[in-house]
């Protein structure tokens, strides 16, 4: 898939992460945990904005990316899993601890995906974009570990 289309799918993925964090913040009873989940939701929105900047760059410099085609299999799988997670939260099929563990696992997967994408780009701006996304995912994962310890 072209870089622009791949980044568009990645935007949808980050939006789904944000929606899940927001939903989790609404159902947890602990205010500190809720506030942290809201912050994570907003940080996912920041990831969306980074990806939008990447799309704008790719559109203005298409010749830099004409030979790069990236699979969206992992992204599409992540989108489906996040949609399922949000539905499970809405239906109360899982509790907050289970939800945190599920989203934690997805953060690990996409930290790795973002690291792998760095190697696919020679262009420094795109490398920086995926480095920022990977660091954000790592930070989210670390904070989720702390949140699990805060809950009973």
Positions of predicted regions on the chain:
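Non-heme di-metal
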Residues: 1-152
